[in-house]
């Protein structure tokens, strides 16, 4: 059934007939990790070079030093304009003197997950179904820490398959099915897609995230919308 995840944001026809792909965007979402590395992670970049690691791996180790909820630091991940909220800007609230760079990094990861949860809840309302499990792919899915935070915020199991390059995997499924190596798409998926890891929500962490999501994150955009518009008006002279 065709359902728009948001007004004027269409669902795209899937490769399988009569099915559609619904999409919710966090524009430049995990790009914020790149931004953080560039602006704040010089120390971790040096450590990564010494250990012949990616800087993101070092940051993921540091990530777990900070408790769920980043000790009240909540980030709204609008570093770039989205389709439905073009005036929105990035915001971080809850700063105290004990917050560090790594608190900001964890707040970025949590903020992206809050934004995705908000989008998923909109889809659930429109299709009148609850999502019971999430499958993740892409660069962020390589991190166990990020996958666990995502499971804790959504409150459902998060699973990843044998490769994070799932667009290429999907293309391979289409090719093999079209070449009649498999009789159906379902048969191809059964043969070629394998769950490698599942992250189960930590109930105590989920309880903390629920509080911050409902009482802080969800209230940020409505309260800040007029401020965002003023900032956007001011910034036009720099565009």
Predicted regions, residues:
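Glycine/Thr-rich phosphate-binding loops that ligate phosphate moieties of nucleotide
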Residues: 1-239
